[in-house]
């Protein structure tokens, strides 16, 4: 029983309603992604490959579920283990500067080292732009989650290591960017 003797109105949600809510969710996410890209452009991000990565990689899958409604806002958000995902502007800026600093064209045989896998979002961006990404994370649970998400997108060009980033990855050095 629900309030004052009324039956709970939502014991079973019809499939049509579930489908409609998923469609609405997709439309909202696409709209928020487009708005985020405009914010990044307004803040000076110009590299079209970087903007395309930010636009297509589903950031909402990399954050804590309680914050999913804020996934495409330009701010850091909690992920797990007291850590946060960087705000999209920082991800875009670091990636844009890395591309400029390594003098690489997208698609060249380049390899980069990422210190701190975290959520795996930055890793996914790098994996779409570089041939090889070596990513170090000190918190095993974060590394395993990031690896699982990124492999589900077919990003097989990432090598993960559970270690302290201060130690680097000497057996794979040198890197074209860090």
Task: Describe the residue ranges of each PLM region.
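Alpha-helical and His/Cys-centered functional microenvironments
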Residues: 11, 23, 91, 126
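Conserved nucleotide-cofactor-binding alpha/beta core module
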Residues: 99-177
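Short hydrophobic targeting helices and cationic amphipathic motifs
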Residues: 3, 7-9, 18-20
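Composition-driven detection of intrinsically disordered, low-complexity segments
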Residues: 12-13, 20-21, 119
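Short, linear, compositionally biased motifs with a strong N-terminal bias
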Residues: 15-16, 130
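Class I SAM-dependent transferase core
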Residues: 25-113, 142-144
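Short, Lys/Arg-enriched N-terminal segments with co-localized hydrophobic residues
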Residues: 16-28
């Amino acid at each position: 029983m629900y309030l004052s003797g009324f039956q709970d109105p939502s014991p079973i949600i019809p499939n049509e309603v579930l489908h409609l809510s998923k469609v609405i969710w997709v439309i909202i996410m696409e709209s928020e992604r487009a708005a985020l890209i405009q914010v990044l452009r307004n803040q000076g991000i110009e590299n079209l490959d970087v903007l395309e990565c930010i636009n297509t990689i589903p950031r909402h899958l990399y954050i804590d579920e309680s914050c999913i409604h804020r996934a495409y806002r330009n701010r850091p958000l909690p992920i797990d283990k007291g850590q946060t995902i960087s705000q999209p502007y920082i991800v875009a800026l670091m990636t844009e500067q890395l591309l400029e600093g390594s003098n690489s064209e997208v698609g060249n045989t380049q390899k980069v080292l990422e210190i701190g896998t975290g959520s795996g979002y930055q890793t996914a961006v790098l994996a779409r732009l570089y041939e090889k990404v070596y990513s170090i994370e000190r918190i095993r649970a974060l590394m395993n989650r990031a690896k699982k998400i990124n492999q589900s997108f077919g990003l097989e060009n990432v090598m993960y290591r559970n270690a302290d980033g201060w130690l680097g990855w000497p057996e794979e050095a040198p890197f074209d960017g860090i």
